[in-house]
């Protein structure tokens, strides 16, 4: 009896773990962020700003700012500034953002500044694609990196030419919203999936009545909603908390060709195959031989002749058997048995897919 109850509890937990809320799988069409961008100046740097002789736009921007403050710089003045840097400022305007609300901004150096650590961003207007100002940014920059240099040597950890200002911008203009207008809303799946779209529509129809949700395509589910903002908010809140059973994912292997990382999901399977992988290494060693005359006054000359030695080695290449694997653990165990490096594993997986032994989509990023 105890074993039966334990098995039943385990089954229920496993079943519940496969269910997810609709809000985690979809988003409401039209409810999205909007990108903002601006150009500004960072001051207060400890000698790590732009070299103004090489970045004339920094000096021009500073002159324009000073003229707006009533300060006139004589024409032709060569200002040797080290504590100022020209930067680009980016931010995201959240959906339903209201005037007075604060948002985070990212500050990135545009010139040849060495570091933005300790700098202060001066008031910078942030514009949208329509060239309208939607927010104003200003504040002290937090840089996550660190660095030091002395005597021709330098040490740097992480990036110093970019930083972030938490709540560094204030929204000054609101975006018009179409939410609450009309009797339909579209839910968009995060990943296109016909079966998942149909399952979400069926779940909504069972709770809200037949015809409440209609699948338009593999990513979009159209939902009939009551009119009015408050009614639609309550309706969406109920729908987004509904749970649906997640269908199995498509088997996929993602390869990052720049970093050499290989990631695969649990749906990946292997068929039996044989793999031979040989490693070829080429070593080039070059030395300079100096030949000098034995007699200092014999009229001979010192001759430098390069000597190059090339060593080519090939290892491995034996044929190894890869067993059919139906679970992710077995797939990992089979691939590890090959003893291949991540870079070698990329070509092996591509060859496996071409041979029909890798039951997965191969995506190279």
Curated annotation (Swiss-Prot):
One of its GO terms (molecular function) is structural molecule activity. It is found in: Periplasm; Bacterial flagellum basal body. The keyword Ribonucleoprotein does not apply. InterPro entries: Flag_FlgI. Residues 1-19 form the signal peptide. Keywords: Bacterial flagellum, Periplasm, Signal. GO terms for biological process: bacterial-type flagellum-dependent cell motility. One of its GO terms (cellular component) is bacterial-type flagellum basal body, distal rod, P ring. The basal body constitutes a major portion of the flagellar organelle and consists of four rings (L,P,S, and M) mounted on a central rod. Belongs to the FlgI family. Assembles around the rod to form the L-ring and probably protects the motor/basal body from shearing forces during rotation. This is Flagellar P-ring protein. It comes from Shigella dysenteriae serotype 1 (strain Sd197).
């Amino acid at each position: 009896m105890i074993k039966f109850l334990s098995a039943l509890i385990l089954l229920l937990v496993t079943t519940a773990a496969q269910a997810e809320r609709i809000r985690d799988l979809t988003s409401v069409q039209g409810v999205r962020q909007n990108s903002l961008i601006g150009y500004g100046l960072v001051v207060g740097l400890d000698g790590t700003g732009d070299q103004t002789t090489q970045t004339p736009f920094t000096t021009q921007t500073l002159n324009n700012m000073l003229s707006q403050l009533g300060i006139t710089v004589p024409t032709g003045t060569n200002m040797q500034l080290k504590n100022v840097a020209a930067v680009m400022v980016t931010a995201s305007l959240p959906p339903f953002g209201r005037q007075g609300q604060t948002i985070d901004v990212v500050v990135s150096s545009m010139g040849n500044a060495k570091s933005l650590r300790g700098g202060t961003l001066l008031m910078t207007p942030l514009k949208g694609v329509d060239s309208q100002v939607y927010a104003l940014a200003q504040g002290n920059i937090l840089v996550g990196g660190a660095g030091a240099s002395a005597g021709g040597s330098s040490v740097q950890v992480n990036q110093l030419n970019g930083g972030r200002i938490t709540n560094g911008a204030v929204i000054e203009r609101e975006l018009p919203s179409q939410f609450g207008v009309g009797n339909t809303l579209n839910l968009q799946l995060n990943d296109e999936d016909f079966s998942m779209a149909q399952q979400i529509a069926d779940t909504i129809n069972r709770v809200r009545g037949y015809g409440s949700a209609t699948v338009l395509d593999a990513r979009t589910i159209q939902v009939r909603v009551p009119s009015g903002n408050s009614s639609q908010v309550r309706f969406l809140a109920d729908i987004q908390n509904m749970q649906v059973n997640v269908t199995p994912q498509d088997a996929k292997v993602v390869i990052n060709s720049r970093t050499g990382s290989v990631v695969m999901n649990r749906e990946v399977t292997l068929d039996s195959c044989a793999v031979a992988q040989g490693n070829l290494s080429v070593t080039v060693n070059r030395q300079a031989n100096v030949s000098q005359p034995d007699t200092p006054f014999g009229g001979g000359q010192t001759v430098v002749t390069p000597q190059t030695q090339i060593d080519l080695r090939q290892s491995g290449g034996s044929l190894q058997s890869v067993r059919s694997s139906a679970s992710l653990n077995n797939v990992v165990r089979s691939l590890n048995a090959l003893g291949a490096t991540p870079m070698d594993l990329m070509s092996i997986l591509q060859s496996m897919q071409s041979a029909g032994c890798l039951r997965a989509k191969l995506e190279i990023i």
